[in-house]
Amino acid sequence: MRVLVAGANGQIGQHLVRLLTEAGHKVRALVRSEDQVPNMRNLGGEPIVADLEAEVSYTAAGCDAVIFSAGGGPGSGAEKKETIDRQGAVKLIKAAREHGANRYLMVSAMGAADPESGPEKMQPYLRAKARADQVLKESGLAYTIVRPGSLTNETGTGKVEAAPSLGRRGEIPREDVARALLATLTAENTHGKTFELLSGDTPIDRAITSL
């Protein structure tokens, strides 16, 4: 499968480019600057430089799937959350439809189901994620929305807990989020579903196929 990864130079994105390549997929790695190109090549991706705040439709041409893992980043203001986390995601939803990339995975966030209940400083981010998620649900694409808990840089354990609603908060290593995305990509049972993701005791493949 040829997969466009948005946010490829992010911490989840770098794990994802490597894992997808190792699994035999062709990865088009969307990055925002030329100085990120060598790293993408080292990870096995085919880099493409584009700004999610500008025109990006062409980046999905020839792809079978899109994984949106981009974001405004920690410390960015509400405006950046709107232009990247919402508008950037929506642009690539439209691009996926235009170019026939029928599979779309969204890296959302735990708390996006009810942004107003989150911490005040997180609400602009959660609102942007929620709005992008809703557009994806209405897109007609074979979508899956993945909502991880608080992200850490610990080494992944390969074990998670996944369910439409877990009823608790918690953490998960970014590496395990990337592994869960890899498993979800080809799991037809996840089409049209939204699920939360935390560290747990179930091997990732089993957790995903059990959704």
Residue ranges and their predicted role:
Residues 153-211:
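Active-site-lining helix/loop region of Rossmann-like oxidoreductase modules
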Residues 29-98, 185-189:
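NAD(P)H-binding glycine-rich loop region in Rossmannoid oxidoreductase-like domains
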Residues 70, 105-108, 149, 198:
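Active-site beta-alpha turn of Rossmann-fold NAD(P)-dependent dehydrogenases/reductases
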Residues 31, 147-152:
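Conserved SDR Rossmann-fold cofactor-binding beta-strand/turn motif
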Residues 6, 26-30, 34, 73-76, ...:
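Conserved Rossmann-fold NAD(P)-dependent oxidoreductase catalytic core, especially the SDR/UDP-sugar
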Residues 12, 66, 136, 146, ...:
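Non-catalytic, hydrophobic alpha-helical segments
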Residues 1-25:
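N-terminal Rossmann NAD(P)H-binding glycine-rich loop of SDR-like oxidoreductase domains
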Residues 2, 64-65, 103:
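Structural motif
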